[in-house]
Amino acid sequence: MNRGYALQYDEQIISYGIKYVLQVIKTLVIAIAIGSVTQKIMNTGIYVYFFIKLRKKCGGYHAPTQEICCTLFGIFLFITILGDGIFLDVHKIIIIVSAFVVYLKLSYEVPCGTIQNPIPNGVKVIMAKELKHYCQIGIFLLGGVSILNIDMGYFAACGVIVCGVLFG
């Protein structure tokens, strides 16, 4: 009897793993598609790099559904890659306002674990400090490169802020 339960539990774990891998592939396909359509593959690579590195190190915000998560990823990727010289003044305002509003909101919610992978309280404190550190660096970089009007530096700062603040 226990053996049947163990097999069913293993099937659930395998099913969850397959769904997770498919979600990651879907997210990467969206990133590649947006990068291809906008002809900003390098910018997309920088964004995805920041996203993965910061998400792994700082935890993150989890949207209520996978569709919302994927949509948010795509929207903020699109906003971020537009920071490389296109609509720069409007983009600066969008990023600065978004960064501060979302940073304030998520300061109380990030990092959060999942049912499958809860984060112990001691680790949450460390991850929250890491997130704040990345956000402070991003905001400092954004301010500096905005004043100096450095497009690629501005884009990198946007990547740090958008990934660090929105996805922790």
Where on the chain are the PLM-derived regions?
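Alpha-helical transmembrane segments
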Residues: 89-104, 158-159
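Alpha-helical transmembrane segments and their cytosolic interface
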Residues: 143-168
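Hydrophobic alpha-helical transmembrane segments in multi-pass integral membrane proteins
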Residues: 80-92, 133-152
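C-terminal ends of transmembrane helices
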Residues: 51-62, 109-114
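Membrane-helix boundary/juxtamembrane motif in polytopic membrane proteins
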Residues: 112-138
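Hydrophobic transmembrane alpha-helices
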Residues: 1-43
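Cytoplasmic-side transmembrane-helix entry/capping segments in multi-pass membrane proteins
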Residues: 64-75, 92-98, 123-125
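Interfacial aromatic-anchored transmembrane helix boundaries in multi-pass membrane proteins
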Residues: 56-72, 78-83
